[in-house]
A protein has these predicted regions:
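N-terminal mitochondrial targeting presequence
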Residues: 1-27
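Short, low-complexity, intrinsically disordered N-terminal modules
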Residues: 1-6, 10, 213-215, 219, ...
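Short linear segments in intrinsically disordered or otherwise low-structure-confidence regions
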Residues: 16-18, 209, 230, 236
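Conserved, structured C-terminal
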Residues: 23-49, 53-55, 128-208, 212-214, ...
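Acidic, proline/glycine-enriched N-terminal capping motif
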Residues: 24-114, 119-121
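Short beta-strand/turn micro-motifs at beta-sheet edges
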Residues: 68, 123-124, 249-250
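Short, charge-rich binding segments
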Residues: 95, 102-104, 112-119, 125-130, ...
Length: 423
C-alpha cells in the first residue's frame, strides 16, 4: 500500500514539483535557511506558496506514522510571520478577525481574516506577545495579500513588521515531542496549555555554562505575565556559538498531536534544528516533509488554505462557524449574518470511502448519479488505510451517514459522510 500511496502523491504533486535543474533555475522561489540541510539529507522538493520546500525524505507514509507514534520535526519556515505593534494593535486586529483576538500575553487563537463579503482571505493564528504587540502567523501563498490587507486598513499608530525571512518556524510534533523539547529548557512545558506559549531558554542537554544572550526586541519580556509561575529565562548574549538561545515557543501545530512550534532566528535555525534531531534519536525522531504534513492534517479535518478554501468561501461554508464570534463588530459580519439567515450555503464535510477508491481534489461528489459537490482534499489515510476526503456538498447531502459516490476517473466509488475528525 505504501508504494502505491507514494506514487499517487507524486502524481498529485507533479505539476508543482521542482524536479529538474532547469525547473529550479527558472522558478523564482524562496528557500528556507535550512535548504542545504534538506538537500544533503536527500529531500525531494516541491514548490508550495512561492517556496521551495521538502516534500518528503524517507517517504510520506513512514514520516506520517513517525509523527503519530513518536516525534517528527518539520521545517515550516514558509509560513508568514508578521508582527503587529502599537497602542491600538488589539483593536485593529480584532476588527479584522472573525474570532476574538486574545488580550492576555502568551495566549494564541486560531481565526479567519475576512473580506467585506464574508469570504476568507486566510486562516491565521494570532498570538498576544504584549498588550500592544502581536504575532500573526499566516499561510505562505496569501502572505502578500494578508500584508496588503493589513496595510489597507492600518491606522497611524499601528506598525507592521514582516519577519518571515528572518525567523524560522519549526514544528516539533508527536506524542514524544514534549519530552524531547523539555530536555532543552528549564521552563516547565507541562504547564504550557494548548494555544499558549512562552519564551524558552534553549540549551542542548550538554554542555551548560554558556554566556547569556539577548532576547530579540520583538519578544522581549513576553511570557512573563500570562503563565503564572512559569520561569522565564534571563536575557542571553546573541551569539549562537555560546550554545544557548531564547525564542518564542507556542503549543500549536497542524497534526493533531502533542507538540510545539518554535520561532528561532535564521542565524539560530540550523543549530536548533540539528540539536533537536541529534538529541531525539532515542525517541525515534525523523525530519518530516510537507507530504506527511498534508496527510496528518487531513486525518484531523484541518483546512488547507488555497484548497479547502480559495477566496470564495465563508467560514460557514468550511465547517468553521465555531470560529465566528457574533457579539462584536468585525469586517464581513453583515454578510455572514445574512448567509446564516438564508441557510442555503454548501457544507464542508468529512467523507470516508467504502471501497478501495482514493479521492483527490476536484473529484465530483454524486448522489444517485446527480452531482452534489466536489472533493476539496483527499488521500489514502496512512493511519486508517482507507480513502478519506473533505468535500463541499449541498446542504441536503451533508448529514453524517449520508451515502454518496465519488467519481474517480469516471468510475463512481461508494462513500459515506462521517463526523470529523477522521482520527
Amino acid at each position: 500500500m505504501a508504494a502505491a500511496y507514494e506514487r499517487g502523491q507524486h502524481k498529485l504533486c507533479s505539476q508543482r514539483r521542482l524536479s529538474s535543474t532547469r525547473a529550479l533555475s527558472s522558478c523564482v522561489a524562496s528557500r528556507s535557511p535550512l535548504y542545504e540541510w534538506h538537500r544533503a539529507a536527500g529531500a525531494r522538493f516541491i514548490e508550495f506558496g512561492g517556496w521551495e520546500m521538502p516534500l518528503q525524505y524517507s517517504g510520506i507514509v513512514e514520516e506520517h506514522l513517525t509523527v503519530r507514534q513518536a516525534v517528527g520535526l518539520f521545517d515550516v519556515s514558509h509560513m508568514g510571520k508578521i508582527f503587529v505593534e502599537g497602542p491600538t494593535a488589539h483593536t485593529f486586529l480584532d476588527h479584522l478577525s472573525a474570532n476574538d483576538v486574545p488580550t492576555s500575553p502568551g495566549k494564541a487563537r486560531y481565526t479567519h481574516l475576512l473580506r467585506e463579503d464574508g469570504t476568507i482571505l486566510d486562516d491565521v493564528i494570532v498570538t498576544c506577545l504584549a498588550p500592544d504587540r502581536f504575532l500573526l502567523v499566516c499561510n505562505a501563498g496569501p502572505r502578500n495579500a494578508v500584508w496588503s490587507w493589513l496595510k489597507s486598513h492600518a491606522t497611524a499608530d499601528v506598525v507592521f513588521l514582516d519577519r518571515t525571512l528572518e525567523r524560522l518556524c519549526l514544528a516539533l510534533q508527536g506524542p514524544r515531542a514534549p519530552e524531547l523539547l523539555q530536555r532543552f529548557t528549564s521552563v516547565d512545558l507541562s504547564r504550557v496549555k494548548l494555544f499558549a506559549g512562552v519564551t524558552i531558554d534553549f540549551v542542548p542537554p550538554a554542555p551548560w555554562g554558556a554566556r547569556p544572550r539577548a532576547v530579540p526586541p520583538e519578544i522581549e519580556g513576553w511570557g512573563k505575565s500570562d503563565l503564572s509561575g512559569i520561569a522565564v529565562p534571563p536575557a542571553r548574549d546573541p551569539s549562537v556559538a555560546s550554545g544557548r538561545a531564547s525564542f518564542l515557543v507556542t503549543r500549536t501545530g497542524y497534526t493533531g498531536e502533542a507538540g510545539f512550534e518554535l520561532f528561532p532566528t535564521a542565524a539560530e535555525g540550523s543549530w536548533v534544528w540539528e540539536s533537536l534531531l541529534q538529541s531525539g534519536v532515542d525517541l525515534g525522531i525523523k525530519p518530516i516533509g510537507l507530504g506527511a504534513r498534508d496527510t496528518l492534517r487531513l486525518e484531523k479535518g484541518y483546512l488547507l488554505s488555497g484548497q479547502d478554501f480559495d477566496g470564495h468561501q465563508t467560514p460557514l461554508e468550511v465547517n468553521c462557524a465555531w470560529v465566528v464570534k457574533w457579539g462584536r463588530p468585525f469586517i464581513g459580519r453583515k454578510a455572514l449574518e445574512a448567509q446564516r439567515t438564508r441557510d442555503d450555503y454548501p457544507r464542508l464535510v468529512g467523507v470516508r470511502m467504502e471501497d478501495r477508491g482514493i479521492p483527490r481534489p476536484g473529484h465530483r461528489v454524486l448522489s444517485r448519479g446527480v452531482d452534489v459537490g466536489h472533493v476539496t482534499s483527499g488521500t489514502m489515510s496512512p493511519s486508517l488505510r482507507v480513502g478519506i476526503a473533505l468535500a463541499s456538498v449541498d446542504r441536503g447531502h451533508a448529514a453524517p451517514g449520508t451515502s454518496l459516490q465519488i467519481d474517480v476517473r469516471g468510475t463512481p466509488h461508494a462513500a459515506r459522510v462521517v463526523p470529523l475528525p477522521f482520527l
